[in-house]
Amino acid sequence: MAAAARARVAYLLRQLQRAACQCPTHSHTYSQAPGLSPSGKTTDYAFEMAVSNIRYGAAVTKEVGMDLKNMGAKNVCLMTDKNLSKLPPVQVAMDSLVKNGIPFTVYDNVRVEPTDSSFMEAIEFAQKGAFDAYVAVGGGSTMDTCKAANLYASSPHSDFLDYVSAPIGKGKPVSVPLKPLIAVPTTSGTGSETTGVAIFDYEHLKVKIGITSRAIKPTLGLIDPLHTLHMPARVVANSGFDVLCHALESYTTLPYHLRSPCPSNPITRPAYQGSNPISDIWAIHALRIVAKYLKRAVRNPDDLEARSHMHLASAFAGIGFGNAGVHLCHGMSYPISGLVKMYKAKDYNVDHPLVPHGLSVVLTSPAVFTFTAQMFPERHLEMAEILGADTRTARIQDAGLVLADTLRKFLFDLDVDDGLAAVGYSKADIPALVKGTLPQERVTKLAPCPQSEEDLAALFEASMKLY
Protein backbone atom coordinates (compact mmCIF):
# COMPACT_ATOMS: atom_id res chain seq x y z
CA MET A 1 0.00 0.00 0.00
CA ALA A 2 1.37 3.45 -0.92
CA ALA A 3 2.45 5.72 1.92
CA ALA A 4 -0.24 8.29 1.07
CA ALA A 5 -2.92 5.60 1.10
CA ARG A 6 -1.71 4.26 4.45
CA ALA A 7 -1.80 7.77 5.89
CA ARG A 8 -5.40 8.22 4.78
CA VAL A 9 -6.45 4.86 6.23
CA ALA A 10 -4.85 5.79 9.55
CA TYR A 11 -6.58 9.16 9.41
CA LEU A 12 -9.99 7.57 8.85
CA LEU A 13 -9.44 5.14 11.73
CA ARG A 14 -8.59 8.04 14.03
CA GLN A 15 -11.74 9.88 12.99
CA LEU A 16 -13.88 6.79 13.58
CA GLN A 17 -12.34 6.37 17.00
CA ARG A 18 -12.96 10.00 17.89
CA ALA A 19 -16.55 9.77 16.68
CA ALA A 20 -17.30 6.71 18.83
CA CYS A 21 -20.68 6.52 20.48
CA GLN A 22 -20.87 8.79 23.52
CA CYS A 23 -24.05 7.39 25.03
CA PRO A 24 -23.88 6.30 28.70
CA THR A 25 -23.72 2.62 27.74
CA HIS A 26 -20.75 2.94 25.44
CA SER A 27 -18.95 6.11 26.49
CA HIS A 28 -16.45 4.14 28.56
CA THR A 29 -15.08 2.52 25.40
CA TYR A 30 -12.74 5.42 24.70
CA SER A 31 -11.87 7.12 27.96
CA GLN A 32 -10.71 10.73 27.72
CA ALA A 33 -8.46 12.70 30.00
CA PRO A 34 -10.48 14.87 32.39
CA GLY A 35 -10.80 18.56 31.66
CA LEU A 36 -10.34 18.38 27.90
CA SER A 37 -13.75 19.87 27.23
CA PRO A 38 -17.19 20.06 28.84
CA SER A 39 -18.07 16.79 27.10
CA GLY A 40 -14.75 15.06 27.71
CA LYS A 41 -14.33 14.58 23.95
CA THR A 42 -11.29 15.34 21.83
CA THR A 43 -13.45 16.19 18.81
CA ASP A 44 -16.18 18.79 18.93
CA TYR A 45 -19.75 17.90 19.76
CA ALA A 46 -21.50 21.17 18.90
CA PHE A 47 -21.68 23.86 16.25
CA GLU A 48 -23.13 27.33 16.29
CA MET A 49 -24.39 29.73 13.65
CA ALA A 50 -23.17 33.31 13.81
CA VAL A 51 -24.24 35.66 11.05
CA SER A 52 -24.84 39.36 10.57
CA ASN A 53 -28.34 40.74 10.29
CA ILE A 54 -29.03 41.19 6.60
CA ARG A 55 -31.57 43.27 4.72
CA TYR A 56 -32.26 42.75 1.04
CA GLY A 57 -34.03 44.98 -1.45
CA ALA A 58 -33.58 47.22 -4.46
CA ALA A 59 -32.50 50.71 -3.26
CA VAL A 60 -32.21 49.53 0.36
CA THR A 61 -28.95 51.52 0.63
CA LYS A 62 -31.12 54.61 1.08
CA GLU A 63 -31.92 53.35 4.58
CA VAL A 64 -28.33 53.42 5.86
CA GLY A 65 -28.65 56.95 7.24
CA MET A 66 -31.79 56.04 9.16
CA ASP A 67 -30.08 52.96 10.57
CA LEU A 68 -27.17 55.02 11.86
CA LYS A 69 -29.54 57.60 13.28
CA ASN A 70 -31.40 54.82 15.07
CA MET A 71 -28.06 53.65 16.49
CA GLY A 72 -27.30 57.14 17.77
CA ALA A 73 -24.18 57.51 15.61
CA LYS A 74 -22.53 60.94 15.75
CA ASN A 75 -19.21 60.40 13.97
CA VAL A 76 -19.21 57.87 11.14
CA CYS A 77 -16.40 56.56 8.96
CA LEU A 78 -17.47 55.60 5.43
CA MET A 79 -14.90 53.31 3.79
CA THR A 80 -14.64 52.60 0.09
CA ASP A 81 -12.06 52.50 -2.70
CA LYS A 82 -11.13 55.17 -5.20
CA ASN A 83 -12.82 53.41 -8.11
CA LEU A 84 -16.15 53.34 -6.29
CA SER A 85 -15.96 56.70 -4.55
CA LYS A 86 -17.62 58.56 -7.44
CA LEU A 87 -20.05 55.81 -8.44
CA PRO A 88 -23.74 55.48 -7.48
CA PRO A 89 -23.36 53.03 -4.55
CA VAL A 90 -21.22 55.47 -2.57
CA GLN A 91 -23.20 58.51 -3.67
CA VAL A 92 -26.47 56.93 -2.55
CA ALA A 93 -24.97 56.04 0.83
CA MET A 94 -23.58 59.55 1.35
CA ASP A 95 -26.87 61.15 0.32
CA SER A 96 -28.65 59.06 2.94
CA LEU A 97 -26.17 60.11 5.63
CA VAL A 98 -26.57 63.78 4.72
CA LYS A 99 -30.37 63.53 4.60
CA ASN A 100 -30.44 62.06 8.10
CA GLY A 101 -27.96 64.52 9.57
CA ILE A 102 -25.19 62.00 10.20
CA PRO A 103 -21.69 63.53 10.35
CA PHE A 104 -19.25 61.36 8.40
CA THR A 105 -15.73 61.19 7.02
CA VAL A 106 -14.82 59.26 3.86
CA TYR A 107 -11.80 56.96 3.69
CA ASP A 108 -11.31 55.93 0.06
CA ASN A 109 -7.79 54.51 0.13
CA VAL A 110 -8.83 50.86 0.40
CA ARG A 111 -6.57 48.61 -1.66
CA VAL A 112 -8.08 45.94 -3.91
CA GLU A 113 -6.64 42.74 -2.41
CA PRO A 114 -5.51 44.47 0.81
CA THR A 115 -2.16 44.01 2.52
CA ASP A 116 -1.06 44.34 6.12
CA SER A 117 0.28 47.79 5.16
CA SER A 118 -3.04 48.92 3.70
CA PHE A 119 -4.84 47.54 6.76
CA MET A 120 -2.47 49.48 9.03
CA GLU A 121 -3.11 52.69 7.11
CA ALA A 122 -6.87 52.28 7.53
CA ILE A 123 -6.43 51.34 11.19
CA GLU A 124 -4.40 54.50 11.85
CA PHE A 125 -7.10 56.57 10.15
CA ALA A 126 -9.79 54.94 12.30
CA GLN A 127 -7.84 55.38 15.53
CA LYS A 128 -7.29 59.08 14.86
CA GLY A 129 -10.91 59.59 13.86
CA ALA A 130 -12.40 58.12 17.05
CA PHE A 131 -15.47 57.02 15.08
CA ASP A 132 -18.55 55.61 16.76
CA ALA A 133 -19.80 53.68 13.70
CA TYR A 134 -18.59 52.48 10.32
CA VAL A 135 -20.07 52.01 6.86
CA ALA A 136 -18.24 49.86 4.29
CA VAL A 137 -19.39 50.34 0.69
CA GLY A 138 -17.58 48.04 -1.71
CA GLY A 139 -16.44 44.51 -2.31
CA GLY A 140 -14.70 42.13 0.04
CA SER A 141 -11.54 44.22 0.15
CA THR A 142 -13.44 47.22 1.50
CA MET A 143 -15.53 45.25 3.97
CA ASP A 144 -12.50 43.35 5.28
CA THR A 145 -10.46 46.54 5.63
CA CYS A 146 -13.29 48.16 7.55
CA LYS A 147 -13.60 45.17 9.88
CA ALA A 148 -9.90 45.38 10.70
CA ALA A 149 -10.05 49.14 11.24
CA ASN A 150 -13.00 48.75 13.60
CA LEU A 151 -11.26 45.98 15.54
CA TYR A 152 -7.92 47.68 16.12
CA ALA A 153 -9.45 51.12 16.73
CA SER A 154 -11.51 49.44 19.46
CA SER A 155 -8.40 47.70 20.83
CA PRO A 156 -5.71 50.38 20.31
CA HIS A 157 -3.09 48.79 22.56
CA SER A 158 -3.12 45.45 20.76
CA ASP A 159 -0.27 44.37 18.53
CA PHE A 160 -1.35 43.83 14.93
CA LEU A 161 -0.54 40.11 15.05
CA ASP A 162 -2.54 39.55 18.23
CA TYR A 163 -5.76 38.83 16.33
CA VAL A 164 -4.24 37.43 13.13
CA SER A 165 -4.83 33.71 12.69
CA ALA A 166 -2.11 31.23 13.62
CA PRO A 167 0.52 30.28 12.63
CA ILE A 168 1.39 33.78 11.35
CA GLY A 169 -0.32 35.55 14.23
CA LYS A 170 -1.38 34.74 17.78
CA GLY A 171 -5.06 34.17 17.02
CA LYS A 172 -6.24 35.68 20.31
CA PRO A 173 -9.99 35.77 21.01
CA VAL A 174 -11.52 39.22 20.66
CA SER A 175 -12.76 40.36 24.07
CA VAL A 176 -13.31 44.09 23.45
CA PRO A 177 -16.64 45.55 22.25
CA LEU A 178 -16.56 46.90 18.69
CA LYS A 179 -18.47 49.78 17.13
CA PRO A 180 -21.46 49.15 14.82
CA LEU A 181 -20.48 48.37 11.23
CA ILE A 182 -22.90 48.42 8.31
CA ALA A 183 -21.67 46.64 5.18
CA VAL A 184 -23.02 47.49 1.73
CA PRO A 185 -21.61 44.94 -0.75
CA THR A 186 -21.18 46.07 -4.33
CA THR A 187 -19.88 42.76 -5.71
CA SER A 188 -21.46 39.32 -5.54
CA GLY A 189 -18.71 37.08 -4.28
CA THR A 190 -17.07 37.28 -0.89
CA GLY A 191 -20.17 37.23 1.29
CA SER A 192 -18.11 39.37 3.67
CA GLU A 193 -21.25 41.20 4.77
CA THR A 194 -22.22 38.03 6.66
CA THR A 195 -18.90 36.78 8.04
CA GLY A 196 -16.38 37.39 10.79
CA VAL A 197 -13.39 37.12 8.46
CA ALA A 198 -10.95 39.74 7.13
CA ILE A 199 -8.33 38.56 4.61
CA PHE A 200 -5.12 40.33 3.64
CA ASP A 201 -1.67 39.78 2.10
CA TYR A 202 1.05 39.55 4.74
CA GLU A 203 3.80 41.18 2.72
CA HIS A 204 6.79 40.04 4.78
CA LEU A 205 6.08 36.37 4.02
CA LYS A 206 4.19 36.94 0.75
CA VAL A 207 1.22 34.91 1.95
CA LYS A 208 -2.44 35.63 2.50
CA ILE A 209 -3.75 35.24 6.02
CA GLY A 210 -6.77 36.46 7.92
CA ILE A 211 -8.40 37.65 11.08
CA THR A 212 -11.20 35.25 11.97
CA SER A 213 -13.60 36.08 14.80
CA ARG A 214 -17.34 36.32 15.18
CA ALA A 215 -16.73 39.64 16.93
CA ILE A 216 -15.78 41.41 13.69
CA LYS A 217 -18.80 40.43 11.60
CA PRO A 218 -20.84 43.42 10.45
CA THR A 219 -23.77 44.54 12.56
CA LEU A 220 -25.91 44.77 9.43
CA GLY A 221 -25.50 43.90 5.77
CA LEU A 222 -27.53 45.93 3.26
CA ILE A 223 -27.80 43.79 0.13
CA ASP A 224 -28.90 46.11 -2.66
CA PRO A 225 -29.11 44.42 -6.09
CA LEU A 226 -29.01 47.76 -7.92
CA HIS A 227 -25.30 47.95 -7.10
CA THR A 228 -24.61 44.90 -9.24
CA LEU A 229 -25.45 46.74 -12.46
CA HIS A 230 -22.17 48.68 -12.41
CA MET A 231 -20.01 45.52 -12.41
CA PRO A 232 -18.05 44.66 -15.59
CA ALA A 233 -18.38 41.14 -16.94
CA ARG A 234 -15.09 39.72 -15.61
CA VAL A 235 -15.75 41.15 -12.16
CA VAL A 236 -19.14 39.42 -12.18
CA ALA A 237 -17.53 36.17 -13.31
CA ASN A 238 -14.66 36.17 -10.83
CA SER A 239 -16.92 37.20 -7.96
CA GLY A 240 -19.28 34.40 -8.94
CA PHE A 241 -16.45 31.88 -8.87
CA ASP A 242 -15.86 32.81 -5.24
CA VAL A 243 -19.52 32.05 -4.49
CA LEU A 244 -19.20 28.77 -6.40
CA CYS A 245 -16.20 27.63 -4.38
CA HIS A 246 -17.63 28.84 -1.08
CA ALA A 247 -20.57 26.53 -1.71
CA LEU A 248 -18.54 23.57 -3.01
CA GLU A 249 -15.94 23.74 -0.26
CA SER A 250 -18.21 24.36 2.71
CA TYR A 251 -20.40 21.42 1.66
CA THR A 252 -17.35 19.14 1.63
CA THR A 253 -15.49 20.34 4.72
CA LEU A 254 -14.76 17.91 7.52
CA PRO A 255 -18.01 17.48 9.52
CA TYR A 256 -18.07 19.55 12.70
CA HIS A 257 -18.19 16.48 14.97
CA LEU A 258 -14.92 15.18 13.48
CA ARG A 259 -13.04 18.45 13.94
CA SER A 260 -10.49 18.62 16.72
CA PRO A 261 -9.67 19.88 19.22
CA CYS A 262 -12.88 20.18 21.15
CA PRO A 263 -12.86 23.62 22.78
CA SER A 264 -12.59 23.74 26.56
CA ASN A 265 -14.56 27.02 26.45
CA PRO A 266 -17.09 28.08 23.80
CA ILE A 267 -15.22 31.36 23.24
CA THR A 268 -12.42 29.35 21.64
CA ARG A 269 -14.68 27.46 19.23
CA PRO A 270 -13.44 28.61 15.81
CA ALA A 271 -15.59 30.55 13.37
CA TYR A 272 -14.88 27.82 10.80
CA GLN A 273 -16.31 24.72 12.46
CA GLY A 274 -16.83 22.19 9.66
CA SER A 275 -19.89 21.15 7.70
CA ASN A 276 -23.14 20.95 9.61
CA PRO A 277 -26.83 20.55 8.80
CA ILE A 278 -27.56 24.29 8.70
CA SER A 279 -24.56 25.38 6.65
CA ASP A 280 -25.25 22.52 4.22
CA ILE A 281 -28.64 24.00 3.36
CA TRP A 282 -27.18 27.42 2.54
CA ALA A 283 -24.32 25.92 0.52
CA ILE A 284 -26.56 23.79 -1.68
CA HIS A 285 -29.06 26.59 -2.22
CA ALA A 286 -26.26 28.97 -3.23
CA LEU A 287 -24.87 26.35 -5.62
CA ARG A 288 -28.25 25.97 -7.33
CA ILE A 289 -28.43 29.74 -7.86
CA VAL A 290 -24.90 29.83 -9.31
CA ALA A 291 -25.76 27.01 -11.70
CA LYS A 292 -28.88 28.82 -12.90
CA TYR A 293 -27.86 32.46 -12.97
CA LEU A 294 -24.08 33.05 -13.11
CA LYS A 295 -23.72 32.66 -16.88
CA ARG A 296 -26.65 34.99 -17.47
CA ALA A 297 -25.25 37.55 -15.03
CA VAL A 298 -21.88 37.55 -16.82
CA ARG A 299 -23.23 37.70 -20.36
CA ASN A 300 -25.92 40.35 -19.93
CA PRO A 301 -25.08 43.42 -17.80
CA ASP A 302 -28.73 44.49 -17.85
CA ASP A 303 -30.08 41.18 -16.52
CA LEU A 304 -31.17 42.48 -13.12
CA GLU A 305 -32.92 39.22 -12.27
CA ALA A 306 -29.73 37.17 -12.70
CA ARG A 307 -27.51 39.70 -10.97
CA SER A 308 -29.98 40.06 -8.10
CA HIS A 309 -30.01 36.32 -7.54
CA MET A 310 -26.20 36.20 -7.58
CA HIS A 311 -26.10 39.02 -5.01
CA LEU A 312 -28.27 36.91 -2.73
CA ALA A 313 -26.28 33.77 -3.50
CA SER A 314 -23.16 35.53 -2.27
CA ALA A 315 -24.83 36.13 1.09
CA PHE A 316 -26.28 32.61 1.21
CA ALA A 317 -22.88 31.04 0.58
CA GLY A 318 -21.39 33.45 3.12
CA ILE A 319 -23.77 32.19 5.78
CA GLY A 320 -22.75 28.65 4.89
CA PHE A 321 -18.98 28.96 4.68
CA GLY A 322 -18.83 31.64 7.37
CA ASN A 323 -19.68 28.91 9.86
CA ALA A 324 -18.60 25.68 8.14
CA GLY A 325 -15.43 27.04 6.55
CA VAL A 326 -13.67 26.36 3.28
CA HIS A 327 -10.66 24.19 2.51
CA LEU A 328 -8.14 23.52 -0.26
CA CYS A 329 -9.33 25.77 -3.10
CA HIS A 330 -9.11 28.75 -0.78
CA GLY A 331 -5.99 27.62 1.04
CA MET A 332 -4.16 27.17 -2.26
CA SER A 333 -5.55 30.39 -3.72
CA TYR A 334 -3.75 32.66 -1.29
CA PRO A 335 -0.24 32.08 -2.67
CA ILE A 336 -1.64 32.15 -6.21
CA SER A 337 -2.81 35.72 -5.69
CA GLY A 338 -0.03 36.64 -3.26
CA LEU A 339 2.87 35.60 -5.53
CA VAL A 340 1.43 37.11 -8.70
CA LYS A 341 4.08 38.36 -11.12
CA MET A 342 2.82 40.38 -14.09
CA TYR A 343 -0.76 39.19 -14.65
CA LYS A 344 -3.45 41.86 -14.64
CA ALA A 345 -7.04 40.73 -14.92
CA LYS A 346 -9.37 42.32 -17.45
CA ASP A 347 -11.95 44.82 -16.13
CA TYR A 348 -10.00 45.61 -12.93
CA ASN A 349 -8.78 49.20 -12.71
CA VAL A 350 -5.70 48.68 -10.53
CA ASP A 351 -2.09 49.83 -10.75
CA HIS A 352 -0.53 46.55 -9.62
CA PRO A 353 -0.46 42.93 -10.85
CA LEU A 354 -3.62 41.13 -9.80
CA VAL A 355 -5.08 37.65 -9.92
CA PRO A 356 -8.59 38.33 -8.58
CA HIS A 357 -9.51 36.27 -5.55
CA GLY A 358 -12.35 34.36 -7.21
CA LEU A 359 -10.15 33.44 -10.16
CA SER A 360 -7.32 32.28 -7.90
CA VAL A 361 -9.77 30.06 -6.05
CA VAL A 362 -11.49 28.42 -9.00
CA LEU A 363 -8.38 27.58 -11.03
CA THR A 364 -7.55 24.67 -8.71
CA SER A 365 -11.12 23.45 -8.24
CA PRO A 366 -11.11 20.55 -10.75
CA ALA A 367 -7.91 19.12 -9.26
CA VAL A 368 -9.01 19.71 -5.68
CA PHE A 369 -12.36 17.97 -5.99
CA THR A 370 -10.84 15.05 -7.84
CA PHE A 371 -8.62 14.67 -4.76
CA THR A 372 -11.26 15.22 -2.05
CA ALA A 373 -13.88 12.91 -3.58
CA GLN A 374 -12.23 9.96 -1.84
CA MET A 375 -14.23 11.24 1.13
CA PHE A 376 -17.97 11.87 0.79
CA PRO A 377 -18.16 10.92 -2.92
CA GLU A 378 -21.96 11.11 -2.78
CA ARG A 379 -21.73 14.83 -2.03
CA HIS A 380 -19.35 15.35 -4.95
CA LEU A 381 -21.80 13.63 -7.32
CA GLU A 382 -24.67 15.67 -5.90
CA MET A 383 -22.78 18.89 -6.63
CA ALA A 384 -21.91 17.73 -10.15
CA GLU A 385 -25.58 17.03 -10.83
CA ILE A 386 -26.58 20.50 -9.62
CA LEU A 387 -24.03 22.00 -12.01
CA GLY A 388 -25.53 20.11 -14.94
CA ALA A 389 -23.90 16.68 -15.06
CA ASP A 390 -25.90 13.57 -15.93
CA THR A 391 -24.99 11.35 -12.98
CA ARG A 392 -27.54 8.57 -13.56
CA THR A 393 -24.91 6.07 -14.70
CA ALA A 394 -21.93 7.54 -12.85
CA ARG A 395 -19.95 5.21 -10.62
CA ILE A 396 -19.41 6.38 -7.05
CA GLN A 397 -15.65 5.85 -7.40
CA ASP A 398 -15.66 8.31 -10.31
CA ALA A 399 -17.35 11.10 -8.36
CA GLY A 400 -14.30 13.34 -8.34
CA LEU A 401 -13.67 12.97 -12.06
CA VAL A 402 -17.32 13.66 -12.85
CA LEU A 403 -17.33 16.84 -10.77
CA ALA A 404 -13.97 17.94 -12.19
CA ASP A 405 -15.16 17.52 -15.79
CA THR A 406 -18.37 19.38 -14.97
CA LEU A 407 -16.39 22.26 -13.48
CA ARG A 408 -14.07 22.43 -16.49
CA LYS A 409 -17.02 22.75 -18.85
CA PHE A 410 -18.62 25.39 -16.62
CA LEU A 411 -15.39 27.41 -16.53
CA PHE A 412 -14.72 26.99 -20.25
CA ASP A 413 -18.19 28.34 -21.03
CA LEU A 414 -17.30 31.43 -18.99
CA ASP A 415 -13.96 32.04 -20.73
CA VAL A 416 -11.78 31.29 -17.71
CA ASP A 417 -8.01 31.38 -18.25
CA ASP A 418 -6.51 27.97 -19.03
CA GLY A 419 -5.03 27.19 -15.64
CA LEU A 420 -2.20 28.57 -13.54
CA ALA A 421 0.12 28.74 -16.54
CA ALA A 422 -2.20 31.30 -18.13
CA VAL A 423 -1.80 33.66 -15.15
CA GLY A 424 1.98 33.44 -15.16
CA TYR A 425 2.98 30.35 -13.18
CA SER A 426 5.11 27.37 -14.18
CA LYS A 427 6.25 24.11 -12.58
CA ALA A 428 9.27 25.97 -11.22
CA ASP A 429 6.89 28.00 -9.02
CA ILE A 430 5.28 24.97 -7.36
CA PRO A 431 7.62 24.82 -4.32
CA ALA A 432 6.84 28.47 -3.53
CA LEU A 433 3.11 27.89 -4.03
CA VAL A 434 3.21 24.91 -1.66
CA LYS A 435 5.20 26.92 0.89
CA GLY A 436 2.59 29.68 0.69
CA THR A 437 -0.21 27.17 1.30
CA LEU A 438 1.26 25.61 4.44
CA PRO A 439 0.44 28.58 6.74
CA GLN A 440 -3.24 28.36 5.70
CA GLU A 441 -4.00 25.66 8.25
CA ARG A 442 -7.11 27.48 9.49
CA VAL A 443 -8.73 26.29 6.24
CA THR A 444 -6.61 23.40 4.93
CA LYS A 445 -7.20 21.44 8.14
CA LEU A 446 -10.90 21.46 7.26
CA ALA A 447 -10.32 19.49 4.06
CA PRO A 448 -12.14 16.14 4.26
CA CYS A 449 -8.87 14.23 3.77
CA PRO A 450 -5.34 15.05 4.92
CA GLN A 451 -2.80 16.36 2.45
CA SER A 452 0.97 16.17 2.39
CA GLU A 453 3.31 18.66 0.76
CA GLU A 454 3.61 16.16 -2.09
CA ASP A 455 -0.18 16.13 -2.45
CA LEU A 456 -0.27 19.93 -2.63
CA ALA A 457 2.49 19.97 -5.22
CA ALA A 458 0.57 17.45 -7.33
CA LEU A 459 -2.59 19.56 -7.09
CA PHE A 460 -0.75 22.69 -8.23
CA GLU A 461 0.83 20.77 -11.10
CA ALA A 462 -2.54 19.37 -12.17
CA SER A 463 -3.91 22.93 -12.17
CA MET A 464 -1.32 24.36 -14.55
CA LYS A 465 -3.75 23.64 -17.40
CA LEU A 466 -7.52 23.26 -17.13
CA TYR A 467 -8.57 22.19 -20.62
Curated annotation (Swiss-Prot):
Phosphoserine-modified residues are: 452
Entries under Pfam families matching the protein: ADH_Fe_C, Fe-ADH
Name the chemical reaction catalysed here.
(S)-3-hydroxybutanoate + 2-oxoglutarate = (R)-2-hydroxyglutarate + acetoacetate; 4-hydroxybutanoate + 2-oxoglutarate = (R)-2-hydroxyglutarate + succinate semialdehyde
| Entry keyword Phosphoprotein | yes
Activity versus pH, per record = Optimum pH is 7.5.
Q: Which residues carry this modification: N6-acetyllysine?
A: 445
Regarding tissue, the record states: Only expressed in adult liver.
Q: What's a single GO MF annotation on this record?
A: alcohol dehydrogenase (NAD+) activity
User: InterPro entries, per this entry?
Assistant: ADH_Fe/GldA, ADH_Fe_C, Alcohol_dehydrogenase_Fe, HOT
Highest taxon in the source lineage: Eukaryota
Q: What is its main location?
A: mitochondrion
Give the UniProt subcellular location, in the record's own words: Mitochondrion
Keyword Metal-binding listed? The answer is no
What's in the keyword line of the UniProt record?
Acetylation, Lipid metabolism, Mitochondrion, Oxidoreductase, Phosphoprotein, Transit peptide
Sorted alphabetically, the Gene Ontology BP terms of this entry are: 2-oxoglutarate metabolic process; glutamate catabolic process via 2-hydroxyglutarate; lipid metabolic process
Assigned EC number: 1.1.99.24
The cellular component terms of Gene Ontology attached to this UniProt record, alphabetical and capped at eight, are: mitochondrial matrix; mitochondrion
User: Reported effect of changing residue 242 to V?
Assistant: In a breast cancer sample; somatic mutation
* Role according to the record: Catalyzes the cofactor-independent reversible oxidation of gamma-hydroxybutyrate (GHB) to succinic semialdehyde (SSA) coupled to reduction of 2-ketoglutarate (2-KG) to D-2-hydroxyglutarate (D-2-HG). D,L-3-hydroxyisobutyrate and L-3-hydroxybutyrate (L-3-OHB) are also substrates for HOT with 10-fold lower activities.
User: Which family does the similarity line name?
Assistant: Belongs to the iron-containing alcohol dehydrogenase family. Hydroxyacid-oxoacid transhydrogenase subfamily.
Protein name stated in the entry? Hydroxyacid-oxoacid transhydrogenase, mitochondrial
* Organism this protein belongs to: Homo sapiens (Human)
Q: Which gene encodes it?
A: ADHFE1
